[in-house]
Curated annotation (Swiss-Prot):
Transmembrane segments: none annotated. InterPro entries: Ig-like_dom, Ig-like_dom_sf, Ig-like_fold, Ig_sub, Ig_sub2, Ig_V-set, IgLON_domain. Pfam families: Ig_3, V-set. Disulfide bonds join 54-112, 154-195, 238-291. This is IgLON family member 5. It comes from the Eukaryota.
Length: 336
């Protein structure tokens, strides 16, 4: 049988609950028999209101609501000092109290005890307080070098006991439990990880995210050489992936280059790439160039060329086809 909805009235039929005996005399209650049947359960969410109602089908001379052994109300007389507990109804047919803003401390056994003309009766209800799941502690953002280990922690509380799930937002990888262990982490595992907790009390789960940064040395992923005529503009490009981002340097024949009118070139660097710009190519600009990308974990270099149009340097040779013998010999010489 499902528990009543939060704030619902729990109808306790006293005449059908001959499970114990109590005597109220001038506000004093002493229990004289043990209860032979279990109490009904009444479930509410933390922060909701709970109405406890005792419906009576006999003439009653005395009636009281108790929490454990503490009297809350005896008839119209208030015994509790808790301002959240108040009397709702006290008639010959019904005796009801209201508990507002229910908290975990309100959970427990409640007893409606009343005296009829013939004998005393009691009936009981066990108030269960559910608490929505919420995250109380989660790991701070993590930065680790590639190949290292990462432990992410997510602590959640709630009643019933909540479930905790870790999820990597990039690829949807999931792991159950408060602790997520990642061994030998790789750059592809960097990104945001989300902790989600839920216990069914509220429709919306609680979630928080942690950013995991994986540091690794630069890897040059692309370079662009150029063939440009004298007097024209040219561009050499170098792209590199690295965390932290790489610092780029350009060299010509082992000489470090910098932007300036004397060199006739400009270095323009963005986050993952650097470009060497020539506004007006002169003969001294032709030759070999080296791009170097470095961060605190390492460095990587790649070479490229600025060539004169028509130059055979760095051009990919073609295999001999239906050509003259001289052409074939020239091709073989180039391969040697």
């Amino acid at each position: 049988m499902p528990p009543p909805a939060p704030g619902a009235r729990l109808r306790l039929l006293a005449a059908a609950a001959l499970a114990g005996l109590a005597v109220i005399s001038r506000g004093l209650l002493s229990q004289s028999l043990e209860f032979s049947s279990p109490a009904d359960n009444y479930t509410v969410c933390e922060g909701d209101n709970a109405t406890l109602s005792c419906f009576i089908d006999e003439h009653v001379t005395r009636v009281a609501w108790l929490n454990r052994s503490n009297i809350l109300y005896a008839g119209n007389d208030r015994w509790t000092s808790d301002p959240r507990v108040r009397l709702l109804i006290n008639t010959p047919e019904e005796f009801s109290i209201l508990i507002t803003q229910v908290g975990l401390g309100d959970e427990g056994l409640y007893t409606c005890s009343f005296q009829t003309r013939h004998q005393p009766y009691t009936t009981q209800v066990y108030l269960i307080v559910h608490v929505p799941a919420r995250i109380v502690n989660i790991s701070s953002p993590v930065a680790v070098n590639e190949g290292g280990n990462v432990n992410l922690l997510c602590l959640a509380v709630g009643r019933p006991e909540p479930t905790v799930t870790w999820r990597q937002l990039r690829d949807g990888f999931t792991s159950e439990g408060e602790i997520l262990e990642i061994s030998d982490i790789q750059r592809g595992q960097a990104g945001e990880y989300e902790c989600v907790t839920h216990n069914g009390v509220n429709s919306a789960p609680d979630s928080r995210r942690v950013l995991v940064t994986v540091n690794y040395p630069p890897t040059i992923t692309d370079v662009t050489s150029a063939r440009t005529a004298l007097g024209r503009a040219a561009l050499l490009r170098c792209e590199a992936m690295a965390v932290p981002p790489a610092d780029f340097q350009w060299y010509k024949d082992d000489r470090l280059l910098s932007s300036g009118s004397a060199e006739g070139l400009k270095v323009q660097t963005e986050r993952t790439r650097s470009m060497l710009l020539f506004a007006n190519v002169s003969a001294r600009h032709y030759g070999n160039y080296t791009c170097r990308a470095a961060n605190r974990l390492g460095a990587s270099s790649a070479s490229m060329r600025l060539l004169r149009p028509g130059s055979l340097e760095n051009s990919a040779p073609r295999p001999p086809g239906p050509l003259t013998l001289l052409s074939a010999l020239s091709w073989l010489w180039w391969r040697m």
